[in-house]
Every structure is written in C-alpha cells, then in structure tokens.
Amino acid sequence: DVAPSRGLGDVYKRQTFRTIPLKYRIDVAMSGRLGMEIQPKNMTEEEKTLCKNAIAEYKTIRPVVQLGDIYRLMSPYDKLGVASMMYVTPEKDKSVFYWWKTEHFVNQHLPRVKMAGLSPDKLYKVHELNRIDNDPLSFEGKTFSGTYLMANGLEIPYNHKVDYHKQNDYSSRVLWLEEVK
C-alpha cells in the first residue's frame, strides 16, 4: 500500500482554537486514504449526507489517488494563501486536483494554480466533487485542453457561495478531470 493516510477528525482544532468546516476536512482527507474518525450520532442529517456523498465520490477517484503520480503544485509553507496538489494516472486520462485556501485576508488576491502532469494533447472535462455551493462553478462540465490547464489553470473562487449562516473563512475544492474521447 503506497497511498498516504489522511483522516477526518474533530471539528474543533485545538492548536488554532478554530472551527474547521466538514467540507474542508473532507477535501483534505480525500487527498489520501479517506478516513473518518467522527461520531455519526453527533452529526446533522446534512453532515451525514455530505459524508455519504464524499465516500461515494472517493470510490471513483481512489485508484487515481492511491496509484497515480502526485504533483505538488503550491506549498502551504510558501504563505501565498493557497495549497494545491493533484494526482494523475500514468495514462494521463484521469486526474484529481485539490485546492485549499490556507490564509484568511480581507480583499485578498489568491494566485491562479497551474496544473501539471496532464497530456498537452488531450481534452479534459471538469467536475467538482463535494460541492456545497448553491450554484456550480463557472467551469463545471466544461472541457479544456491539457495545454490550457497546465499553462493557465482555472480561476478558483476564494469562497463558497452558500447561504449566509454557512459562510466561513475556509474554502476548498476537489476537481475530477476526465479525458474526453
């Protein structure tokens, strides 16, 4: 077994005294072997549904995460406000792209993350996993060339477009890219 282990734990982070949303924790855990160390009896129905959907979606991407080539795109240690990585199959026909907002500023401008490891000649359809936004991303279901994605990346929104009572400082995205044949 070669995949990194990542688990989904408590909502409250003792080191930072902050509450980290379930979506963000799921997206981090999905970048390894998705594990959940939480009590279902303490979860709302909405949280249970989000976890069930994440498990189902993870089953689709698991071979790519566990056996694909890893590309570390932006390090959280660079303090640019974003961390990002992706996995790509050896055939370059499927990929999982991860994006996490790591810093919290007012009127911030986050860098656009260029992807890596894709085939320049292939076309890829983009689908967001674990979506919580009221509306899909502007590029949901659209097709882009590997050349474009590696030269430009995609414009990732800094925040989730959710109802007011669900807004918070954390934002994360998981994108599934699949070759269009």
Describe the role of every protein-language-model region:
Residues 1-8, 12:
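Single conserved hydrophobic/aromatic residue that forms the stacking wall/gate
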Residues 9-10, 28-39:
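Short acidic (Asp/Glu) and glycine-rich catalytic loops that position anionic groups and cofactors
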Residues 11, 64-67:
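Active-site loops and adjacent core secondary-structure elements that bind or stabilize anionic groups
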Residues 18-32:
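Aromatic-lined glycan-binding groove of carbohydrate-active enzymes
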Residues 36, 41-49:
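N-terminal leader/propeptide and maturation segments of large enzyme subunits in energy/redox metabolism
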Residues 77-120:
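Carbohydrate-binding surface patches
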Residues 103-181:
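C-terminal beta-sandwich/jelly-roll accessory domains of carbohydrate-active enzymes
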